[in-house]
């Protein structure tokens, strides 16, 4: 009788008539309390209904009656696993497998429990055993692929995921996971293919859209990434991860203000999400709102005091721009103390965690405080080399010098900015004009987007590599090329290059003045500078050995001016305005020098100062405008009558603005470099005064090389007087213009610095082996 009732209950169970099934299971148990199958099936029903705790008790009763039933132990394991009691689940699966070792599905379940318990190695063994016993287990193959990817065993991951797609070709998940493997390999084109395949199979797969967006971000195709994230949100607005990714994509476009609501939305669905909290801090940091950024870094650190990106930014973040000199001092002291704190933290930190911190920040803005940064740069450099050497010990020891006699020297150049960028314009002449009879030139471009400048530079060298996927990929190529000398055109502007510079990849390593400050790195041997730019005590400002190339130190090509330049009216400038072009990034303007502009305006009628808006944010532009308003107010002048801000311009429009201007005002303590050279090409009179450090003496050096010293002020008073005279004395202004035009040949296309560089490099190598 009980057997018939049990069969009837099971039929109800299978057909989804669960209430009827439950009644009959209870009836069977009442009639025969030793009916283990009834206890087991009743437990399975409770499990299906989501009452896992009841299921556990019922199945345990079944096992007490029939302890050798393997399926009972598996069912108990499933109930424990669904209830979150992972170790008990593992124990139950192991009991099952002790009774039935070839039970492939249970090995899969054991893998699921290990995986949920963060035991990656245990899960891998379980899944591998499962697929050996039964090769068509999709779950085991798919999850193996996920775990192999996490272990960076990418070929294994690809193999098992391909098997999974063959077993279940219409299941989108394995295709999506294949895309993630290729993302991990930084093969973004292939990743995009597989994510798209997943979406074809399941157009509502929000995770696949999110992952596709991440792959597009890997290729720097941010607009396509944003489209994917919007689609993800449309399908599933409660998917938390997309808000972090969307915000990061907007930040990559410089749209920090737009990113903030998406980060905050991510926090609404996951309030303790430390990565999103830190990302919010970064967004406020890049908006120039330092104090707001600090609040979010503090919030992140209350969740995890050792979260490296938040910790490093909390202690070492610097504002983009300052409201006054007191702020400069306050933030500098904060950075100095923070550097000591981080140095102590690194002593006990996990190597990879420390690397995350190092990768999250640079000292870029430190140099815009107008101080001697040698000691602070050296402290940060010591941190960098320590962290990099622990993470990459194989790339941190000194390279032995090979015999260079009777062969060409192998010289490498690396930068993220071998594209239409100041760095490329300043240093392409070295790459082009190093004598190919004596040098094989290797170029390593680590930026994501190439352009006509990239193509041009590639044509100048014997070996060109465009590698933006990872530090490891760049380093491995450099090591394969077995260079004699590696030259960094800039350090301090790109996280990738900054970390590479902290490694020892060639016997001799040099730094150029693309970012004109000492690296502070023991891995950099020489700083390649300019004899005209350095002050007499210049060597004291560097941890590297200072090398003075003649003139301005570079071979700079004559800029090509637009055939049909825009006129003043197109920049909202009047014909009778006296236009002073001051076109630097706003972080170059120190607040103690704001008075210079109203001091000139007070004496030059219809003076108009033209600035370029911040690339970072409107907030930074508004902060600078507020400073200028205060400075002009102190002179009883209205800032808006004299100051014009233009948006970022195309290269040709920027040159048109130079051609439409009357006078170029150099920034104080951080001089124009490429901008000054382009102003010279447009025959603009350059007003400058030499700063304390090389970075404040670029324009001074350029004018000295052209033997035009009458617009160089010995001090700020002279600077203002020269600017005023140029504004009021049109005849003198034209004389200076004519002189500049006549002397272009003294500054442009000068090959002597590159010839000197070649001789220096050969001398260094020959002395090393003699």
What spans do the regions from the language model cover?
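Structural signature of tandem alpha-helical TPR/SEL1-like repeats
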Residues: 2, 14-23, 48-61, 71, ...
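Conserved alpha-helical positions within TPR/SEL1-like repeat arrays
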Residues: 6-10, 14, 37-48, 71-82, ...
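N-terminal subdomain of nucleotide-sugar transferases
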Residues: 264, 277, 286-464
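Active-site-proximal region of nucleotide-activated glycan assembly enzymes
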Residues: 337, 357-387, 505-565
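Conserved nucleotide-cofactor-binding alpha/beta core module
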Residues: 392-524, 529-539, 609-753
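Nucleotide-sugar donor-binding and catalytic loop/hinge architecture
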Residues: 394-410, 562-580, 602
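Conserved donor-binding/catalytic core segment of Leloir-type glycosyltransferases
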Residues: 408-416, 574-590, 594
């Amino acid at each position: 009788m009980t057997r018939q009732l049990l069969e009837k209950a099971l039929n109800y169970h299978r057909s989804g008539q669960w209430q009827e099934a439950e009644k009959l299971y209870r009836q069977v148990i009442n009639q025969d309390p030793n009916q283990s199958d009834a206890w087991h099936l009743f437990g399975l029903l409770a499990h299906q209904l989501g009452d896992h705790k009841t299921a556990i008790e019922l199945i345990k009763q079944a096992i007490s009656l029939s302890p050798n039933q393997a399926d009972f132990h598996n069912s108990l394991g499933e109930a424990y696993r669904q209830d979150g009691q992972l170790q008990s689940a593992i124990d139950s699966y192991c009991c099952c497998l002790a009774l039935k070792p070839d039970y492939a599905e249970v090995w899969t379940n054991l893998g699921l429990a290990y995986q949920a318990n963060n035991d990656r190695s245990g899960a891998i063994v379980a899944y591998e055993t499962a697929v050996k016993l039964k090769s068509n287990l999709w779950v085991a193959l798919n999850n193996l692929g996920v775990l192999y990817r996490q272990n960076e065993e990418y070929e294994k991951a690809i193999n098992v995921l391909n098997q999974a797609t063959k077993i279940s070709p219409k299941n989108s998940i394995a295709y999506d996971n294949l895309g993630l493997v290729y993302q991990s390999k930084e093969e973004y084109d292939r990743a995009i293919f597989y994510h798209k395949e997943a979406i074809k199979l399941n157009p509502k797969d929000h995770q696949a859209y999110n992952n596709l967006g991440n792959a597009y971000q890997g290729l720097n195709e941010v607009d396509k990434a944003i489209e994917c994230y919007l689609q993800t949100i449309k399908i599933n607005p409660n998917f938390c991860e997309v808000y972090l990714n969307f915000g990061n994509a907007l930040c990559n476009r410089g749209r920090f203000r737009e990113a903030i609501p998406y980060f905050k939305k991510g926090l609404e669905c996951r309030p303790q999400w430390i990565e999103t909290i830190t990302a919010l801090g970064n967004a406020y940091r890049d908006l120039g709102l330092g104090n707001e950024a600090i609040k979010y870094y503090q919030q992140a650190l209350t969740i995890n005091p050792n979260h490296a990106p938040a910790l490093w930014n909390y202690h070492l973040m610097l504002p983009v721009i300052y409201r006054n000199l007191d702020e400069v001092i306050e933030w500098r002291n904060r950075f100095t103390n923070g550097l000591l704190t981080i140095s102590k933290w690194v002593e006990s930190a996990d190597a990879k965690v420390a690397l995350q911190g190092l990768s999250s920040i640079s000292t870029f803005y430190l140099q815009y405080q107008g101080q001697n940064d040698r000691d602070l740069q050296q402290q940060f450099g010591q941190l960098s080399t320590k962290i990099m050497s622990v993470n990459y010990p194989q790339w941190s020891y000194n390279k032995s010098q090979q015999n260079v006699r009777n062969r060409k020297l192998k010289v490498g150049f690396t930068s993220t900015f071998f594209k239409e960028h100041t760095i490329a314009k300043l240093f392409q002449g070295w790459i082009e004009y190093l004598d190919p009879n004596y040098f094989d030139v290797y170029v390593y471009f680590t930026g994501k987007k190439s352009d006509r400048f990239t193509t041009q530079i590639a044509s100048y060298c014997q070996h060109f590599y465009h590698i933006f996927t990872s530090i490891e990929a760049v380093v491995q190529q450099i090591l394969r090329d077995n260079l004699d000398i590696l030259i960094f055109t800039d350090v301090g502007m790109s996280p990738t290059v900054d970390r590479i510079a902290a490694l020892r990849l060639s016997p001799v390593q040099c730094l150029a003045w693309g970012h004109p400050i000492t690296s502070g790195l023991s891995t950099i041997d020489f700083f390649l500078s300019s004899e005209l730019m350095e002050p007499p005590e210049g060597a004291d400002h560097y941890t590297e050995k200072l090398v003075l190339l003649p003139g301005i130190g570079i071979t700079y090509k004559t800029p090509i001016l637009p055939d049909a330049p825009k006129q003043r009216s197109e920049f909202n400038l009047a014909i009778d305005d006296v236009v002073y072009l001051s076109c630097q990034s706003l972080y170059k303007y120190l607040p103690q020098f704001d008075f210079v502009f109203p001091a000139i305006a007070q004496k030059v009628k219809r003076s108009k100062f033209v600035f370029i808006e911040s690339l970072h944010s409107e907030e930074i532009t508004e902060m600078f405008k507020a400073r200028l308003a205060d400075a002009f107010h102190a002179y009883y002048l209205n800032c808006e009558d004299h100051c014009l801000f233009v948006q970022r311009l195309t290269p040709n429009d920027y040159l048109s603005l130079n051609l439409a201007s009357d006078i170029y005002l150099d920034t104080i303590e951080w001089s124009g470099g490429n901008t000054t050279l382009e102003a010279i090409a447009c025959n603009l009179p350059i007003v400058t005064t030499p700063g304390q450090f090389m970075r404040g003496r670029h324009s001074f050096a350029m004018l000295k090389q052209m033997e035009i010293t009458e617009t160089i002020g010995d001090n700020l008073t002279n600077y203002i007087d020269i600017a005023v005279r140029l504004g009021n004395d049109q005849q003198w202004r034209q004389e200076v213009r004519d002189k500049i035009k006549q002397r272009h040949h003294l500054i442009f296309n000068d090959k002597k610095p590159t010839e000197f560089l070649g001789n220096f490099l050969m001398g260094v190598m020959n002395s090393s082996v003699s």
